[in-house]
Amino acid sequence: MKEIKGKVDFREMDKEIKEFWENNEIYQKVKKLNENYPDYYFVDGPPYCSGSIHLGTAWNKTIKDTVLRFKRMQNYNVLDKAGWDMHGLPIEVKVEHEFNLQSKKDIETKVGTDVFIEKCKEFALNNKEVMENQFKNLGIWLDWENAYLPIKNDYIEAGWWSLKRAHEKELLSKDLRVGYWCPRCETSLAEHEVRGEYQDVLDPSVYVKFKVADDNSYPNTYFVIWTTTPWTLISNLLIAVNPEFDYGFVEVIFDNERKETWVIAEALVEAVIKLAKKQNNIKSYNIVKKVKGKELEGIKYVPALLEENERQKEFFQLEKVHTIVLGEHVSLDGGTGLVHTAPGFGEEDFEVGKKYNSPIYSPIDDEGKYVEGKWKGVFVKDADEDIIATLTDKNLIVNAGKKKHTYPHCWRCKTPLLFRSTEQWFLNISKIKNNIVEHAKNTDWVPNWVETRYINGVKFVGDWNISRQRYWGIPLPIWICENKDCGKYKIIGSVEELKQEMINDIPINDDLHKPTVDKIIMKCDCGCEMKRTPDVLDVWYDSGLAPYASINAKELKKADFIVEGNDQVTKWFYSQHALSEIVFDDIPYKKCMMHGFTLDETGEKMSKSIGNVVNPDDVVEEFGADLLRFYLLSANKAWEDLRFSIGEMNDVKSVFNTLWNSYSFAVNYMVLDDFSPNEEYFNYLRDEDKWIISKINSLTKEAIEVLEIPHLHEYTWKVRDFILNDLSRWYIKLIRNRTWMEKEDPDKLSAYQTLYYVLMKLVVILAPVAPHISEKIYQNLKIEGMPQSIFMTKIVVEEEYINKEVEEGIETAREIVDAILKGRDKVKYTLRYPISKIILPNELGDIVNKYHYIIKEQGNVKNIEVKEFEGNISLKPNFRTLGASFKSDVPAVVKILNSQNPKELKDKLAEGEITIDGFTIKPEHVEFKIDIPDNIVGMELRKGSVYIDIELTEEIIKDGLKREVIRRIQSMRKDMDLDIEEKIKITMEGIEFNEDALKDIEKEVRGTFEPTIECDNIQEWNIKTPNGEVYNLKIGVKKN
């Protein structure tokens, strides 16, 4: 045990402890120590290797590390591979920027696929190293050496194997469907990639007329639709109405007496006409006819952009195209009650089109540009205004404006998405959705309401589009026959199978990515060649494989614990569950925890453009890793969003400084007295020692309970409360005088033994969240025979030391002291001035008998009287309860009560209800008030009250001044950076003390008074006593 000198530097401590761990291979030794104990399988939700870590990922990894350190200290064999997301758009978009590429086409024409893919790999690996070091800087212990990397062949092979399983179970299919499409990244996206990626946009809002084709039956009649995507009108093939809604044929008369008939849902006629009047000279309108929507089915109309697109003329010749169709999806929430339907550009449109055997027409390319018609080569959104202008010229616009609404964006490049029909590969989730829901109920969710959110999300999920038209990802292991009439395909499940099936001589090296696998050719049963589909897998498929691909397993090993952020509930939690259901028919995790988002102090999302981003490296540099870790877990409940606050970081710093000061106080006195821990000293414990020993074991027990859940906020709050309130502000104050006793006094040694025991237990339970300071303290306190590292110890509750009776007794004494201190504050009677006496009720007599010395010393009280306080008692009838009990007899009862002796009545009612003049009086019928003299302050306790005599005497003033002087001299010693044992010489002017008082001061401050000395430190103060007197104090101190 070494003396603690100087101020603590948490950042330097981080570096020192990390060196100790690394030089002594502590992580590896802990793994070895626990290898024969039960497994605790953890799956690391992989962060993208696309840049540096941020505060959210720091929080995420701190949660993980805290739980895993706890489990290691419970002797679990923790399987803790780190994981990384290394494929997909997050990497590709960054690499495109590095090459200054403007489009997907540039990848192939300006760089080359092979170079681009190699650069993606290099980019991912480089960022992995950077981020790994940042995590290590936070003190994160994971198996970094054997981390799972989705770019490795074994992981890719696991993906292929799982896809073949899906095929074997008839859960894989290729289909033409409408889905999300990013025109910048030129790829399809899955539904879960878009959740949470909606942004407010300002789009056109246009009401358009479609003329009824049969002018004889419906002269000058138009169906009116509303859309925010005028660019899709070129592909309009149907208009949908609700079969059960009422539709009005509205005769519209313009100022020039021209007439038209507009068909609009009756409930929306007024709103639509109101808008129309803003841009049309409408004189009047009238509903001339009403029909049900189903009566409109089959009526043919003329597409609004017939002349602008030759293909529309072809479609117009088809009987069931450009007709009114029925759809339950049509609502009255807005618009006109008639829905423009382009089966190639909308999910509901697509389903309606299939129902009516309509063509699926989507005349745009991968970049979102038209491939035919008037606007050929134009990006669809760029055509909006010209399309509106064209429709205006054709007198088909009822109203054209703008509307702000939420719209899906690409989760990586943030481009507004398009809905587009393409052929993609799908996992048929609809077939196993019920299993996913049922198995989700068997998992422990933290917090438990996440289960409902997850299940509700699953219920509305569609089939999973897993194919991406990109480059950097797990290649789809699907080889398709080149003979269009054949259409057969093979799905490869392993490298061995690949080698067996390939017919050309392509070396299979250690990289199964494009473009190598694209060159492999197979032979179809029909005799033709088979080539691989060029697509790669959705990157969420990569991370979904983690539970088994990360450990190269082909059997389900359920994770004991996973945790990720709010946005992953319907993303990573879902992707791994869906794949596990497909492969193993079960959920892959036992316990699933969600945490919130990190925001700035005002609740705003952190953004580089706003300039409010907090870099965790900067916080660690200023405060140290442990303080950031503790803050992240204690700032609020994990599932709530965290508003980062430097002020709250400083509060955590105060907690850790308090811990360090408590530790240094203990160690420095132990070193001074050459103390060695010895359990024999437990034979001399006082009750306050037994109390803190019981409290640290109770804390350990409670911490284990909440860490098991895990409720990490409760864990950190409990530890913080123990450090600040139980250890520093109470126990150390209780034993301070015992540390000044003679060297071999058992009373002092038992206090040291208690402090040693408590500090050791405390750092063990603190270690999961604050590993550096815990290791630092442990290394200085450990004695021969103890494990090399604190992380080789076990968190243990010593139940035999938990004594609830002692805890309750000391807590009551502390409550009394706290009440005395609050009473002092109330009247500005500082603790340095003694109180002549306090009065406590009889029911606290046993506490006073046991702990009078604690109450006197900590409250600075000279005498304690145990009796009922005899102030003047007055009574007041409680009219609220009297009215309920006595109704019209209340006046009579009040008269009776007012005639009673208040003290006698109070004593009688203390034993229960009484009867007076035939009326039953209960305790709640009367309120009693004790009138307290001016020199007494009353403070309530759980049991009764404490009455504090604040009368000042000359003796009390002198005692207080003595303490004032001691405090000033101790402060001067601290300023001079003197060690505990160093003695001083003192001069003093301004206050006269007798010889006994001077000796008391000398003993406390380790000094001697001298008439005159040449001082190293001279200071002056004006000291004001509680009665208002002011003393001009001057003190000089010199090192002896």
Curated annotation (Swiss-Prot):
Alphabetical list of NCBIfam families matching this protein: ileS
Protein function: Catalyzes the attachment of isoleucine to tRNA(Ile). As IleRS can inadvertently accommodate and process structurally similar amino acids such as valine, to avoid such errors it has two additional distinct tRNA(Ile)-dependent editing activities. One activity is designated as 'pretransfer' editing and involves the hydrolysis of activated Val-AMP. The other activity is designated 'posttransfer' editing and involves deacylation of mischarged Val-tRNA(Ile).
GO biological process, one term: isoleucyl-tRNA aminoacylation
GO cellular component: cytoplasm
Source taxon at top rank: Archaea
Lineage of the organism: Archaea, Methanobacteriati, Methanobacteriota, Methanomada group, Methanococci
Protein name from the UniProt record: Isoleucine--tRNA ligase
GO molecular function (one): zinc ion binding
Motif 'KMSKS' region per UniProt: ranges: 605-609
